[in-house]
């Protein structure tokens, strides 16, 4: 079974050499996929489109993630709807071949409790699943 590596990129990596990334290795494994940060809440990452298009042009598989700022399930669903709209508006339908992920890691969100965080994740993922 072949083994591959992947990375995540965002505004924190403004200058990416996508071709070098494609030919690079992580822990000896070739880089095959990249998870690109789409947004912080519903504010698009300023390098989202550049990163997605650069990775696709280099022949890398692309997934995206949304760094959530939601405080409840309705806001999480709105984040998912925003992401779907953004993907469609930028003609990325069918080009995102790796998962769409939900990044829930703000300390203030942990304080909401397990039930609320679970409901937020479910609302986001159910909305994404209906799109896919």
Where are the regions that the model predicts?
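Substrate-binding cleft of extracellular glycoside hydrolase catalytic domains
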Residues: 2-125, 129-131
